[in-house]
Swiss-Prot record:
GO terms for biological process: cytoplasmic translational initiation. This is ATP-dependent RNA helicase eIF4A. Residues 59-229 form the Helicase ATP-binding domain. Residues 240-401 form the Helicase C-terminal domain. SUPFAM superfamilies: P-loop containing nucleoside triphosphate hydrolases. It comes from the Eukaryota. It comes from Cryptococcus neoformans var. neoformans serotype D (strain JEC21 / ATCC MYA-565).
Amino acid sequence: MSDTKGAAEQGLQIDGDLINSNWNEVVDNFDDMKLKGELLRGIYAYGFERPSAIQQRAIMPIVTGRDCIAQAQSGTGKTATFSVSILQRIDTTVKKTQALVLAPTRELAQQIQKVVIALGDYLNVDCHACVGGTAVREDIARLNEGPHIVVGTPGRVFDMINRGALKTEAVMMFCLDEADEMLSTGFKESIYEIFQLLPGETQVVLLSATMAPEVLDVTKKFMRDPIRILVKKDELTLEGIRQFYINVEKEEWKLETLCDLYETVTITQAVIFCSTRRKVDWLTQQLHDRQFTVSAMHGDMKQEEREVIMKEFRSGSSRVLITTDLLARGIDVQQVSLVINYDLPSSKENYIHRIGRGGRFGRKGVAINFVSNEDKNMLEEIETYYNTQVEEMPLNVADLI
């Protein structure tokens, strides 16, 4: 893989033809995957009818115990891919932690926990979310009960292993979700330390939207002959998402543009992304002053506060959420029909994580980008990177949402 790494170190998005998929077997329905009956019931009760492309390819090899690297965009069913595989592999009669899943944010870890519990509803599965912002004593007590599956953020998980609360001797599966995000946000050391503390034969499953150099390093150091299921760059589509831009010229005109849009469009649910926490607070205040109902969420807020806001947003009692990139990957709300990039993301990779929120699993969505004169270059870069066309917003945008 050395030439791949060279390309990666030059800061290039790695082309699909440099690291080819080495697994092409497709199983296109859940009934043919030889899954436990209770797990199948959970899958259908959750609302899945047939597996997504990544599920059709990855579940079977993961269930057989192979190490696996899966590259797929946000919103393609990655969480269910490893959740189903873990639930199939673990033995729920054994009261020990058998699978460990890491995620970059608390919100994503809690989201994964919810999916695991829902899919494992008929299996009596015990799944614990081990995240910062919660009482250490409670965490230790829960981990001493030996939950079958632990989902957590790297810092807290490492701490719990060190304290002897999270016992790893029975761990047979280690899964890294959104690996690119975790490794780029300073968790690398904790993740490497955790690897050293797991049994040598632990199966490793890694999921990532992009194959950054840090991700490739992990695959080389810790994975044995992995199956690679890779979506080529030009296949990282934004399928089903209608993308538009509004030319606002000046930064200070964005607010009025947003207010106009708010009045034209009936929004079921929308997420508005800003570049900084301060901007989130400012915009929320501006909209409140104009009698618009919106909620806001960012990393400076207390954990309990963030949970209340997410609950309101999920239940639909709050319809518009203003947030930052940090939380883009933890928002999984089925009804999100509109994403507004008040500020374009500072990195091209984050674009897919933001607008992948709308239209998940084939549901249609609309993304509207506010573009000032300074943003034009970034928009062009995004179009080139994703091989996509962002059109000027039509007057009848209300009919499309």
